Amino acid sequence: MAQKIVRVGDIQIGNDLPFVLFGGMNVLESRDLAMQVCEEYVRVTEKLGIPYVFKASFDKANRSSIHSFRGPGLEEGMKIFEEIKKTFKVPVITDVHEPHQAQPVAEVCDIIQLPAFLSRQTDLVVAMARTNAVINIKKAQFLAPQEMKHILTKCEEAGNDRLILCERGSSFGYNNLVVDMLGFGIMKQFEYPVFFDVTHALQMPGGRADSAGGRRAQVTDLAKAGLSQKLAGLFLEAHPDPEHAKCDGPCALRLNKLEAFLSQLKQLDELIKSFPAIETA
């Protein structure tokens, strides 16, 4: 089964290629912190030879509480992304929540992301597709892997086939998520690159009453399990001080563990992709 390759600048993204990292922080807490986090990601990924795209949100529009921190907003967020791109020479990915945001975000960011909670919103999907930007489509917690085909079709019929699928876990009762490893193979049948968002798969939605809890201690185990499925890439959030992060700190990898973490994952990815395919159907 031929697998599509999506190109972002000099980076080639495909299920049979070395894994690509979409990594950064959950939300743009400040310009200085974003620069600090990106600098460490760039240092580590350059050392290890991992293709890298910086990730952060300019607005967290789906926080549990109305009092929760949301970010700097569209205008200021794009300024920070422009500075990061200029300073570190890396592509940037961020999420879009409303149709009117799609075009201005696509003019700055190399990849625009369709949030899991909004992945069936046709007007948003079409607006994003019409920018012709690369789109990272998060699989909603309530969707089966095979249902992602409908979202791909919406994008394709709007004229965009520069698409990536991203698993982030499925609802398992209340305040819990699980990852079905068989789902990766189902989504790969659509031939588009498939990523694994290990950070948000560790969430415990609403687990702290007014915010999400998480299981940071299990990030390495889950990331290894995901990449064992021969994926195009990993989606990861890290923070220098997770206990005081303004969003999803309980899920974030400690930034000072990034090199050791990615070193093991690179070795695993190389091993998995060295194996010949076995036809078992």
UniProtKB/Swiss-Prot annotation:
GO terms for biological process: keto-3-deoxy-D-manno-octulosonic acid biosynthetic process. InterPro entries: Aldolase_TIM (IPR013785), DAHP1/KDSA (IPR006218), KDO8P_synthase (IPR006269). It is an enzyme of class 2 (transferase). Signal peptide: none annotated. Keywords: Cytoplasm, Lipopolysaccharide biosynthesis, Transferase. Its main location: cytoplasm. Gene3D superfamilies: Aldolase class I. It holds the Pfam family DAHP_synth_1. Coiled coil: none annotated. Pathway: Carbohydrate biosynthesis; 3-deoxy-D-manno-octulosonate biosynthesis; 3-deoxy-D-manno-octulosonate from D-ribulose 5-phosphate: step 2/3; Bacterial outer membrane biogenesis; lipopolysaccharide biosynthesis. One of its GO terms (molecular function) is 3-deoxy-8-phosphooctulonate synthase activity. It catalyses: D-arabinose 5-phosphate + phosphoenolpyruvate + H2O = 3-deoxy-alpha-D-manno-2-octulosonate-8-phosphate + phosphate. It is found in: Cytoplasm. GO terms for cellular component: cytoplasm. Its EC number is 2.5.1.55. It comes from the Bacteria. Belongs to the KdsA family. This is 2-dehydro-3-deoxyphosphooctonate aldolase. It comes from Pseudomonas paraeruginosa (strain DSM 24068 / PA7) (Pseudomonas aeruginosa (strain PA7)). The lineage of its organism: Bacteria, Pseudomonadati, Pseudomonadota, Gammaproteobacteria, Pseudomonadales.
